Curated annotation (Swiss-Prot):
UniProt enzyme class: oxidoreductase
Residues that hold 3,6-dichloro-2-methoxybenzoate according to the record: 229, 250, 284
A GO BP entry: catabolic process
Catalyzed reaction equations: 3,6-dichloro-2-methoxybenzoate + 2 reduced [2Fe-2S]-[ferredoxin] + O2 + 2 H(+) = 3,6-dichlorosalicylate + formaldehyde + 2 oxidized [2Fe-2S]-[ferredoxin] + H2O
pH dependence: Optimum pH is between 6.5-7.5.
Quaternary data: Homotrimer. The dicamba O-demethylase multicomponent enzyme system is composed of an oxygenase component (DdmC) and an electron transfer component formed by a ferredoxin reductase (DdmA) and a ferredoxin (DdmB). In vitro, dicamba O-demethylase assays in which DdmA2 is substituted for DdmA1 demonstrate that the two enzymes possess nearly identical activities.
Binding site for [2Fe-2S] cluster: 48, 50, 67, 70
Name the record gives this protein: Dicamba O-demethylase, oxygenase component
Upper classification of the organism: Bacteria, Pseudomonadati, Pseudomonadota, Gammaproteobacteria, Lysobacterales
Cofactor binding: number and manner: Binds 1 [2Fe-2S] cluster per subunit.
Record InterPro entries: Cholesterol_7-desaturase, Rieske_2Fe-2S, Rieske_2Fe-2S_sf, VanA_C_cat
Cofactor: [2Fe-2S] cluster
Listed GO MF terms: 2 iron, 2 sulfur cluster binding; metal ion binding; monooxygenase activity
Amino acid sequence: MTFVRNAWYVAALPEELSEKPLGRTILDTPLALYRQPDGVVAALLDICPHRFAPLSDGILVNGHLQCPYHGLEFDGGGQCVHNPHGNGARPASLNVRSFPVVERDALIWIWPGDPALADPGAIPDFGCRVDPAYRTVGGYGHVDCNYKLLVDNLMDLGHAQYVHRANAQTDAFDRLEREVIVGDGEIQALMKIPGGTPSVLMAKFLRGANTPVDAWNDIRWNKVSAMLNFIAVAPEGTPKEQSIHSRGTHILTPETEASCHYFFGSSRNFGIDDPEMDGVLRSWQAQALVKEDKVVVEAIERRRAYVEANGIRPAMLSCDEAAVRVSREIEKLEQLEAA
């Protein structure tokens, strides 16, 4: 499969990393991720150049990653710094590939492509995750589907009415107001739900209030698969800027052609010190992401080989505009790298 390699992807959450290496495959590339004694995260190819043992099974010795097989040691840049055998020679062939890493917004970003092109300024903004005006709860999930299926799912805001009916269904669905905005390296899908009864989830945000409300469900896409959702609610007629809202992290990183990593979070501007609201959002994440979206996209993945082998093309609905635009942008990025 063709992956877009010259881009920033999330490899891990900060709490996943310590001096014990984490092995994780990204874009069919095995990585060893670990935090060095100075706190800086290192990412090395998870293959020792000697006999190809996984370095993620090793340990840190004096700040260096030691291979579990023959004891070669590597610094965070991938250079072999110790060879315990023979005369201790360390030719260039003993060095291992390292990858650019940036820790930002409580996310570990990695650049799997040409290191010379790795510009930290191109990392999309997820500052709400560390903004003291917000409270963030989230986590990591593994999904057995091609990452593009989840991109389609997330950019299609209308699916919530059916897939997430237990929590997000609205009686104002027939009055939805939609807009798609295309910017420089960014696509937004905006949806307003005017004058409806609060959904089950929104009612929890409002502490059980049941008066007519306006609600919003927006999402922003940045290459290649980083999305920031905005769900909000306010009494009918209230400006969007005065709503209570949650900004949702939805970042997908391909693992293989048929699996991906899902980094998610909800950053809210209300009930910041309320552990009960933490529970509401964790329950929503477990239900919507694990029990609902995951089930749907994994079922589609199991049919993907048949669909592709038989040249079946998807029928289009009016709600597909944002997802289709994003799909085309990803195709352009793939073609650009392949050229």
